[in-house]
Amino acid sequence: MPVPPPPPPPLPPPPPPLGAPPPPPPSAPPVSTDTSSLRRADPKGRSALLADIQQGTRLRKVTQINDRSAPQIESSKGTNKEGGGSANTRGASTPPTLGDLFAGGFPVLRPAGQRDVAGGKTGQGPGSRAPSPRLPNKTISGPLIPPASPRLGNTSEAHGAARTAPPRPNVPAPPPPTPPPPPPPLPPPLPSSSPIKTPLVSPPGPLTKGNLPVVAPPVPCAPPPPPPPPPPTPPPLPPASVLSDKAVKPQLAPLHLPPIPPPLPLLPPCGYPGLKAEPASPAQDAQEPPAPPPPLPPYASCSPRASLPAPPLPGVNSSSETPPPLPPKSPSFQAPPQKAGAQALPAPPAPPGSQPFLQKKRHGRPGAGGGKLNPPPAPPARSPTTELSSKSQQATAWTPTQQPGGQLRNGSLHIIDDFESKFTFHSVEDFPPPDEYKPCQKIYPSKIPRSRTPGPWLQAEAVGQSSDDIKGRNSQLSLKTLR
């Protein structure tokens, strides 16, 4: 209330100066008489300026306008209507508009507190007041928006339950370390690297649901947990399978060691993480439940970072009947092929040689182990960038041994190969050999003394012609050398 009154006071001071200018043309005394008469006869104002000044004085006197506006805007509307009528009759509406703006502004602030009443009335108010009601409405919608965000979260949970999933991955993750006392060391490294651990547990979910894999690939980096929520029913199987896998891994690995040697080339790529071996063992433990294969995709999800681990496996995975449908369903190319590979070749993934290798690879995957395996392939692939044939030969040489591993660990190399595979390059042999370089004396016109003697212009012209001839000769020589 005290704040609104101050604005009107400034208005009164201007009236005297404004009143003063009109009187100056006549004599000084008549000025006072005119002002007094005008003040006495309000409706009969001689000039619009005087009428405006008088209106301002009235507004100043009626400081209660602020009080009227304070309770509700309707009162201010009534005052506006009255003032507007008087202003129209007098021909000056500017001061009342200013007063309305001030009065409307203050009540708008008050209704902000009263969202319900102020919202409707402010909406009825003039355009200047309308924005303020919109703000309260927005504030009301603001609370609604937060629920919307939870709804979005719910939708995300329905699609991937990224936020809710984390607790689930955490829950299954703790059990695996506890059940197998010997393997606990292996899980700890994975927990140390949260991203890796989460993918192990979370990927199973996305794999179980073909639609979710889309969310899984983007999520694997930060929130791999989303996939697990989708398969609430299978999750018990995956945790049990994971626990049983970890507990039985030692047994499974020795059992499948004989088949391991042949698949080793394929396994090393998957084995570099050592995680793939684990998924394979789950598949072996329980091939009936689809949950065990999902664990493999988690590693695949980790491998997707390599970006092309799957392509090598699809050929091998095609043999398995069930895997083929899965790969088409899941947009993530890497995860489905690995699933197929796990199902088709449960023994090969499990047999990365022996658990000691798995442990080493697991420890190495976050850090040195994987890096050591992959770096060697990188230089050969990059060194012969100029010659595709040599590169392809080297790539083939690497493929039997560590091609998948290199692809999984070092996705950049594989990406480079794919990028170059999109284009066809000619080998150096396809191009004709360059002509032999024959040293020849070149004559440059700049070195020719232009004016041996200050002769006539004809000599200069002759020199110019000779320079042109020399240029032509040089160009021909250069072309021959280039050919």
From Swiss-Prot:
Motif interval(s): Profilin-binding motif: 3-8, 11-16, 20-25
Gene Ontology BP terms: Arp2/3 complex-mediated actin nucleation; cell differentiation; endocytic recycling; exocytosis; retrograde transport, endosome to Golgi; spermatogenesis
Residue ranges, compositional bias (Pro residues): 1-29, 166-192, 215-239, 256-271, 289-298
InterPro entries linked to this entry: WASH1 (IPR028290), WH2_dom (IPR003124)
Family matches, as Pfam families: WH2
Keywords: Actin-binding, Cytoplasm, Developmental protein, Differentiation, Methylation, Phosphoprotein, Spermatogenesis
Any GO CC annotation of this UniProt entry: early endosome
Modified residues (Asymmetric dimethylarginine): 46
Cystine residue pairs: none
Bias type Polar residues, positions: 63-78, 87-96, 473-483
Compartment(s): Cytoplasm
Motif RLRK boundaries: 58-61
Coiled coil: none
Biased composition (Low complexity): 277-288, 299-308, 331-345, 393-404
Domain WH2: 45-62
Stored PROSITE patterns: WH2
Subunit structure and binding partners: Interacts with WASL, and monomeric and filamentous actin.
Function field: May be a regulator of cytoskeletal organization. May have a role in spermatogenesis.
Domain notes: The WH2 domain is found in a number of putative actin-binding proteins.
Family per record: Belongs to the verprolin family.
Name assigned to this protein: WAS/WASL-interacting protein family member 3
Source species: Homo sapiens
Phylogenetic placement of the source organism: Eukaryota, Metazoa, Chordata, Craniata, Vertebrata
